[in-house]
């Protein structure tokens, strides 16, 4: 019997028997019938097929596929205590454990694959280049590096591609948590500070971090927490966002140092980051290439922050209780507490 003569319910099962995403795409493009049938494929099946093509087509692995799919598991877990515990357990095994968690509970659509693949060239790679100029080889190649060439010289072992995806993953994971603080009247659920900190603790390898249950980082040269802490505290990071805010949101926006910065400015920067890939388009894409949808969303975020009467509450961490972390997503201070081992 010819393939296309099979009943529709049988054709719908075909994607589950394919070996990878290339076979899926080739079959879907072979004729209109299969294209229409494959359009109904479950997101979990598409993610499994994409995983079978990694790392050849989705690198760096596993960060790229985690960035593409982690919002789906965040949505699945948010507001459910038992599911949030499973998510935190996944964090504690590192990024590969989080990847496995995404495969088990998450999913991808073809549109999301296309969107993320395009974002690699328009957003992720340009962001990686900017981070390399803040903390990587380009930064350390600045003339007179140790003698005034940069304002914050340091010795860092930085993988800029990995760092870009790590902060994008954070935004994709906790974007809806920020929405809860932008819309306080709606009483939306959010992940708490501890859950957010555990992402940094376990999913960013660092040889000086105590949060390494299997000892895998003991003799490594990973410094991912230290690197991201440096980036998020740096003046270049603030200036990058300030330039985008002036371009798209407020031509009169000014950039002060962290001590003098109004809480709304920091919250705006964090809230744009918490849009994930969409938010980073503001700083990574050329101004004329930023989608209008991303600009409109950013303006809505700005307006909601301006409408807030007071900043979100904070909690203090550390032995002396001197490290404040906002109850709203606060990546700079969360990774700072994680790196400084102030839990003990």
Task: Pin down the residues of each PLM region.
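Charge-dense, extended regions
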Residues: 192-344
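Short helix-loop-helix/strand-helix junction enriched in hydrophobic and basic residues
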Residues: 7-14, 22-43
């Amino acid at each position: 019997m010819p393939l296309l003569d099979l009943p529709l319910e049988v054709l719908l099962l075909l994607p589950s028997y394919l070996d990878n995403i290339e076979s899926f795409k080739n079959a879907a493009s072979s004729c209109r019938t299969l294209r229409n049938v494959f359009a109904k494929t479950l997101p979990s099946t598409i993610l499994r097929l994409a995983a079978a093509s990694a790392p050849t087509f989705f690198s760096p692995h596993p960060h790229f596929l985690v960035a593409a799919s982690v919002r789906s598991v965040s949505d699945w877990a948010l507001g459910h205590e038992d599911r949030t515990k499973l998510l935190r357990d996944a964090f504690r095994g590192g990024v590969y454990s989080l990847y496995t968690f995404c495969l088990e509970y998450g999913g991808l659509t073809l549109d999301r694959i296309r969107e993320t693949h395009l974002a690699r060239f328009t957003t992720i790679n340009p962001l990686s280049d900017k981070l390399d100029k803040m903390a990587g080889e380009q930064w350390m190649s600045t003339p007179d590096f140790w003698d005034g060439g940069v304002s914050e010289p340091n010795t860092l072992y930085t993988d800029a591609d990995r760092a870009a995806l790590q902060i994008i993953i954070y935004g994709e994971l906790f974007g809806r948590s920020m929405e809860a603080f932008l819309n306080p009247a709606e009483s939306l659920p959010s992940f708490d500070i501890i859950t957010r900190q555990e992402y940094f603790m376990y999913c960013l390898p660092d040889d000086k971090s105590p949060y390494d249950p299997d000892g895998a980082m003991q003799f490594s040269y990973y410094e991912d927490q230290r690197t991201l802490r440096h980036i998020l505290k740096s003046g270049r990071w603030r200036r990058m966002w300030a330039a985008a805010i002036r371009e798209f949101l407020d031509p009169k926006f000014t950039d002060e140092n962290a001590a003098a910065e109004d809480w709304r400015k920091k919250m705006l920067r964090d809230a744009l980051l918490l849009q994930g890939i969409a938010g980073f388009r503001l700083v990574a894409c050329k101004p004329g290439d930023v989608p209008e949808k991303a600009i409109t969303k950013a303006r809505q975020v700005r307006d909601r922050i301006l409408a807030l009467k007071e900043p979100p509450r904070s909690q203090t961490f550390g032995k002396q209780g001197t490290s404040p972390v906002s109850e709203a997503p606060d990546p700079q201070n969360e990774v700072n507490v994680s790196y400084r081992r102030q839990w003990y």
